[in-house]
Amino acid sequence: MTDSVGGAFFGRQIPFLELIGARAEHWEKGRAVVSVDVRPELTNSWKFAHGGVVLTLLDVAMGAAARTTDAKGHGIVTVNITVNFLRSSSGLLRAEGRVLRGGRSLVFCEGDVKDVSGETMAIGIGTFRLKKRDGDAK
């Protein structure tokens, strides 16, 4: 299953992801892959991917993986993310999020970001809360 992250990932518009050009490549129960082509406006002063872009990819990939565990279609909000930046990179970046454990309201995930050569540039862990949206059916 694939879709545009900003366009309709899980049927939701996410304007910030449209702005940076993030794309959903794949999602299945407990796993999601998201990518972005690092344009000049997404780089730091050394012309590598800005750390905020890398963190965003991890947040989206892990959050999307967490969301795949919920049969009720709740939204996801980030409770906590810890990221370790291992190396700098640019070009196409791909983040994979994986569920470690899920419960009724919290989902624990891990993820990594790799560059086009397959080198890992960042790893992270995150906690996500399943949250009913106002107006959604129970």
Question: Which stretches of residues belong to each language-model region?
Answer:
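Terminal targeting signals and extreme-terminal segments of soluble enzymes
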Residues: M1-K138
